[in-house]
Design a protein with these regions (language model features):
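Bacterial N-terminal signal peptides
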Residues: 1-8
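Export/targeting segments at the very N-terminus of extracytoplasmic proteins
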Residues: 10-50
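Solvent-exposed loop/turn segments at secondary-structure junctions
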Residues: 48-51, 70-73, 118-121
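A short, structured beta-strand-centered segment in the mid-to-C-terminal lobe
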Residues: 81-88
């Protein structure tokens, strides 16, 4: 009877179980990019529920559901398969999230929205020298 009670109280497998497998990688990526760990976890829950091999609609990949073009704009040289590797995905996803975090002035809700909708296009539109001018990728503002 004690065994049955213990099993009934045991947590079910789900996002929380998967989360712990990536805690150390998430902490390192967050630290390297100057963003709160909780923000990274929030984006991962929203985007993939800790499913590293998830391929989403619109060509988004891995834990943070990052696009290949976005990762490449941040220096990634591999293919889409590489973005399914949790460490690689976090390296580029958190780097992109850091830009959204800075643009949101540290506001987590806005940072999540900017990350989800693609803040680079908004940044380019706001900082284009004149309407119709060719746009180049502008660097994100430096962290304070």
């Amino acid at each position: 009877m004690v065994t049955v009670a213990a099993l009934a109280l045991a947590p079910s497998a789900g996002a929380d179980d998967h989360r712990h497998a990536y805690d150390a990688m998430i902490a390192a990526a967050a630290r390297a990019n100057g963003v709160p760990e909780a923000l990274v976890h929030r984006v991962i829950v929203r985007e993939s529920r800790y499913q590293p091999r998830l391929i989403g609609q619109g060509g988004v990949y891995g834990l943070m559901q990052i696009k290949l073009a976005t990762a490449r704009s941040l220096g990634y040289r591999g293919d889409t398969t590489g973005l399914l590797d949790p460490e690689t995905n976090l390296a580029y996803g958190v780097k992109y999230l850091a830009g959204a975090w800075r643009m949101a002035d540290g506001n987590e809700d806005r940072a999540v929205r900017y990350y989800a909708r693609g803040y680079n296009e908004n940044h380019l539109r706001l900082h284009s020298p004149r309407p119709g001018a060719p746009r180049s990728l502008l660097p994100a503002p430096a962290a304070p």
